[in-house]
Amino acid sequence: MKFQPAFAFPLLFLFSGIVSVLADSPGMADLGSGFIYSDLKKGDSREVVLDKLRKGSFIQIYEERDRGLIKCSVRWNGFRYELTCKLVDDKLELCLIEGQKGWQFSFYDEVLNPQWKNLRERLVAKYGKDRKFRDFPKLKQVPMGDPGGFVTDSWDLNDRLLMLTVQSFKIKDCCTNKMVEYSCCTLLIQPKQGK
């Protein structure tokens, strides 16, 4: 059977679409660049943040206006995270990168730990090993419902503070109406005042 040229363009279009969806998101911002993450700057307005995310080819962009949040997907090394941009008085204040949330007994070791490790390795490669750190915790070590979670790594840099954490919290299950314990890893990127 001969290859039909009529199939070449649709296949090429499909392949390029798959590659763009699987491509890595932008990396962490350089020190002293003035950027929090990617090309997002402290003080960017809601419209500017949305425009930069669209132009940066981020996907699944949505807003929670009542909470001052803009969210989208981030992908690094095959892992999917969620970027949350926190706005205060319509100005970007900080960014939070959150791993997948899960509740199954195997989730913590099989999904959360590799996501956390991927984030840690990216941060060490970018900002160096000079930080406060401790090992990945056992689930029972993670404080339940504490917004700060269990801090595993923190970088106190000239222009930003980075904190990598593991969190545990309860969410009401819509099917059983019972509280279910979830966990995830998070990375807080907080620019320093005046920087």
Question: Residue locations for each model-derived region?
Answer:
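Boundary at the C-terminal end of the N-terminal hydrophobic targeting segment
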Residues: 21-23, 29
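Bacterial N-terminal signal peptides
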Residues: 8-17
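Short, exposed beta-strand "edge-strand" segments with a Pro/Gly-rich flavor and a Y/T-containing core
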Residues: 19-20, 37-44, 124-126
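Generic signal for short, ordered secondary-structure residues
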Residues: 28, 32, 101-102
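Bacterial N-terminal signal peptides that target proteins for export
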Residues: 1-9
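A cross-family detector of function-defining hotspots
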Residues: 44-195
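Short, recurring structural edge motifs at helix starts
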Residues: 33-40, 106-110
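Short, compositionally biased low-complexity segments
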Residues: 24-25, 90
